[in-house]
Every structure is written in C-alpha cells, then in structure tokens.
A protein has these predicted regions:
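Basic amphipathic alpha-helical segments that dock to polyanions
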Residues: 26, 41-49, 90, 112
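Short, cationic-aromatic polyanion-contact patches
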Residues: 1-8, 22, 54-79, 109-115, ...
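Exposed, interaction-prone assembly regions rather than primary DNA-binding/catalytic cores
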Residues: 85-168
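Residue-level detection of the helix-turn-helix DNA-binding "recognition helix"
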Residues: 16, 31, 42, 46
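Short acidic, hydrophobic short linear motifs in intrinsically disordered regions
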Residues: 17-30, 59-65, 70, 86-104
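Pre-recognition alpha-helix immediately N-terminal to the DNA-recognition helix
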Residues: 6-13, 85
Length: 168
C-alpha cells in the first residue's frame, strides 16, 4: 500500500516537472507498462491531483498538472484544417459569438474543449453562446462580450474616462 502511494507521488512529480505527458512517457520513467501507468494516471485524475486533456496524441490523452494548461498548445500540430482555423480564430479574438460563426466553426468549437470555454449569456431575454479562449480572464471576456452586444462601446468607455478626468 505504501509503495503504491510512493509510486503515485513519483508520477505526480513527473507530471509536474515535464508538463503534459502521455502514459507511455510516465511508464518509461517509472519502469511499468503503459496500462499500469494509465491506471495510476486515471486514479490521480479521479482524485483531482492531475488533469486530463481532450487533446489526443496518437489516441492517448495528455495528463497535466493544474497551471500547465498553456502548455497544451504544443500539441495542436495534429489538428486538421478546420480545427486549426477555429483554434486560430478564437486565440486571436479571445471571445467569439457563436451565432456569428460559420456552421463548421461552431461545430469545431464544441470539440475544442481544452481551448474553447462556452459561456451562456442572457441579454434582453435572449440567451446566447459565446466562446472564451481558455487563457482569457473572465473580466476581459466580459468586456469583449459587452462590446459585441453593444452594451459598452470602446469609444463610450474612453469618453467616460475623459469626463472623470475632466471633473478632477
């Protein structure tokens, strides 16, 4: 029992040190089969000590430590053209309005679970889906969504700031 806990701690340290890893890499490091390494990684994922990606490399998911999400971008080379287009569009714009996207992009965004976070926004009794780039802060996303909805335009914000400064 103690040996299994020691082994899990070693696996956690490997994931922490190497970033997103495949079960085969962990297996080689600790000298066990891919199947056993996968089982230990699954247990660590269930206990929320390690995260699992939706991105697959050769059919295997990547395992990573909380805070290493940005490192998942290294594994997007295997994306097909549609996935790459949606990935690039979202990474450049930070927030996308679902209803403004081409149907193929809308479908792909739903599959890019590691990078595209859905936000259900209620506005004027309507509910809309927006997609947030996974590294975008909630505050930044809120500003961008408000701009897209016409709640606050960048010019209005500048004018508000000018008025505040003029009153000082």
């Amino acid at each position: 029992m103690e040996k299994a806990l020691e082994l899990r701690e070693k696996i956690v340290e490997i994931v922490k040190a190497k970033g997103p890893v495949l079960p085969v890499q962990v297996g080689k490091e600790v000298g066990m089969s891919i199947l056993m390494a996968s089982a230990h990684l699954a247990e660590l994922t269930a206990s929320k000590r390690v995260k699992i990606s939706n991105v697959k490399v050769g059919g295997s998911p990547l395992y990573y430590f909380p805070g290493q999400e940005a490192m998942l971008q290294k594994f997007t080379a295997s994306f097909n053209d549609k996935e790459k287009k949606a990935f690039d569009l979202l990474s450049q714009n930070k927030v996308l309005r679902d209803s403004e996207q081409e149907p193929v992009i809308r479908v792909v965004l739903r599959d890019l679970k590691d990078f595209a976070l859905p936000l259900n926004v209620k506005y004027n009794n309507n509910q809309e889906i927006f997609w947030k780039w996974y590294l975008t802060t909630d505050q930044e996303a809120e500003k961008l969504i408000k701009t897209k909805l016409g709640i606050e335009r960048p010019e209005e914000k500048i004018k508000k700031e000018e008025k505040i400064l003029a009153n000082d």
